[in-house]
């Protein structure tokens, strides 16, 4: 059984920046999650092919019934994991969920480099959502948090056993 026992160096200041910005964004998380996902597709249009509910859809993104719930779950998981990183010292997504996420990403043909796109989309979304809080320090804190979650998923990207 794979365990994510790596303790993460995430400073108190980084945690405070992430928590403060996440608290400021939470109330708009439905709208922001859609923006986040739209940015992924803007940065990497071929990513649309990775999602069965988008692949052959002619429906505009904002009218796709499956996109918003998916975007919301990805955005919330990313942000909640980031906010818990220092307190827990590791990614707080349950191991069974990480295994499922890893297997699903593997099956869909996701490669580690794809997570750079999600990181850029996340940072762009946060920068637009809380411009008054945006700084190099905030960017770095969110980048570290994203990379920790991405690494945990990538570690589980293998065929289901």
Swiss-Prot record:
Mainly expressed in root nodules and leaves, and, to a lower extent, in roots, stems, flowers and fruits. Accumulates in mature root nodules. InterPro entries: Globin (IPR000971), Globin-like_sf (IPR009050), Globin/Proto (IPR012292), Leghaemoglobin-like (IPR001032), Leghaemoglobin_Fe_BS (IPR019824). Its EC number is 1.7.2.-. It holds the Pfam family Globin. Binds 1 heme group per subunit. Its cofactor is heme b. It comes from the Eukaryota. The record marks 139 as: Homodimerization. Residues 9-158 form the Globin domain. Heme b binds at residues 52, 66, 70, 100, 104-105. One of its GO terms (molecular function) is oxygen carrier activity. Disruption phenotype: Normal vegetative growth but slightly delayed flowering and reduced pods number. Gene3D superfamilies: Globins (1.10.490.10). It catalyses: Fe(III)-heme b-[protein] + nitric oxide + H2O = Fe(II)-heme b-[protein] + nitrite + 2 H(+). Keywords: Heme, Iron, Metal-binding, Oxidoreductase, Oxygen transport, Transport. A motif (Homodimerization) lies at residues 42-46, 112-124. Induction: Induced by abscisic acid (ABA) but repressed by ethylene and cytokinins (CK, an equimolar mixture of kinetin and 6-benzyl-aminopurine) in roots. Slightly induced by sucrose in seedlings roots. One of its GO terms (biological process) is response to sucrose. Belongs to the plant globin family. Homodimer. Phytoglobin that reduces nitrite to nitric oxide (NO) under anoxic conditions (e.g. during flooding or in waterlogged soil) and upon root nodulation. Required for general plant development and during nodulation, especially for the onset of symbiosis. Monitors nitric oxide (NO) levels during early phase of the nitrogen-fixing symbiosis and buffers oxygen in functioning nodules. Necessary for the production of pods. May not function as an oxygen storage or transport protein. Has an unusually high affinity for O(2) through a hexacoordinate heme iron because of a very low dissociation constant. This is Anaerobic nitrite reductase Glb1-2. It comes from Lotus japonicus (Lotus corniculatus var. japonicus).
């Amino acid at each position: 059984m794979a365990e994510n026992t790596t303790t993460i160096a995430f400073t108190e200041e980084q945690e405070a920046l992430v928590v403060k910005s996440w608290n400021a964004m939470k109330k708009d998380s439905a709208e922001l999650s859609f923006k986040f996902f739209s940015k992924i597709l803007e940065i990497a249009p071929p990513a649309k092919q990775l999602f069965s509910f988008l692949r052959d859809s002619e429906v505009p993104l904002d009218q796709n019934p499956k996109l918003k719930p998916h975007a919301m779950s990805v955005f919330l998981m990313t942000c909640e994991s980031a906010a818990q990183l220092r307190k827990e010292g590791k990614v707080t997504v349950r191991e069974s969920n990480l295994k499922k996420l890893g297997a699903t990403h593997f099956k869909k043909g996701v490669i580690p480099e794809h997570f750079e796109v999600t990181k850029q989309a996340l940072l762009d979304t946060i920068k637009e959502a809380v411009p008054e809080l945006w700084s190099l320090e905030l960017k770095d804190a969110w980048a570290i948090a994203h990379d920790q979650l991405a690494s945990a998923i990538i570690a589980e990207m293998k065929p289901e056993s």
